[in-house]
Amino acid sequence: MMSVKTGALVRCHPAMALVAAALLCSACVSTSTTPKTTEKPTAPPATSTQKPAAPARGGTTPAAGTEAAAAKVPTITAADGTKIAYEVSGTGPALLMLHGGGQSRKSWAERGYVDRLAKKFTVIRLDLRGSGDSGRPDTPAGYALDKVVADILAVADAAGAKRFHLYGFGHGATIGRYLAAQSDRVISAVLVGMEMGPAVSGPVKEALTSMRAKWQPMLEAQKAGTLDIKKLSPGDRDAWEHGVALSAIALGALLDYPPVQPADIKAPTLWLVGAADASGMENVKQFEGKLAGTKVTFKPLAGLSYTDSFARIDPVLADVEPFLASTAQPAS
């Protein structure tokens, strides 16, 4: 299910059809930061369960209740005015970490990743736009891939990292594959729980198209001052008040993201998928034969589901730490 609270894991393939239905009808509120579901995120998390403030015209809407928290952490300001929050911990080669859907930069620390990795790396964590303490654009263009990538590189600049290792989980890994394919600044990449090929396809693509078509006109009407919330159905009104409209816009941005093939990736990359992640492993079957001669090395995480591939830090880092050590370069 799609969570409308940050901190939960949400999945796209193949369960996005259920996610889309939930978003179209009402808000689905998560009550656990470690849900039993193994649904996979490939999209930014939904907004807070508090009623969102009216989106700024042509700008961004901060997450409800996060203004004070955002003031306590460093931020960069993107060219479109979106604030991107980040944190830096540890010393050593730079390691930039991209969180999964329904998560924030804090998720890495809560699971113990920062304590482990900051012993040998300068760990740089950010809230992707639409997440945590970062701003929330209210148009599809606000989540364009080039803007998301520019945010990440700007955070690396602010942290003093000319080049860096990359670690992404879920949606963060989906974004990370574009960086690994496009930027010479990536020394190496660890991509966990992501899929090669299109960002979205098939029923998922159809669901996202419907979601964006439903909610984008409402946001435009709100900005024009013509939206009458009272005229919405009870389900749509509840969903609106839970921030689903902005979530639909963020999710819909994936429709515009291009596919990535293993051969496109320029940096040495460790691709990890839980062996018990059925849809993830189905994707692996499609691409495993295309890895020869590329920079991508695939390893299954024995016995782990999608959720486990983030939650169970010890077996995951048993593969990650040796790979990072083998590709590590001095901090720069």
Residue ranges of predicted features:
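Flexible "cap/lid" loop of the alpha/beta hydrolase fold
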Residues: 174-177, 181, 189-219
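Short beta-strand/loop motif that positions the catalytic acidic residue
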Residues: 265, 271-273
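Conserved loop-alpha-helix segment in the C-terminal half of the alpha/beta-hydrolase fold
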Residues: 273-304
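Conserved HGGG/HGGXW glycine-rich cap/lid loop of the alpha/beta-hydrolase fold
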Residues: 82-133
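C-terminal motif of bacterial Sec signal peptides marking the signal peptidase cleavage site
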Residues: 25-27
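Catalytic histidine-centered segment of alpha/beta-hydrolase-like enzymes
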Residues: 304-314
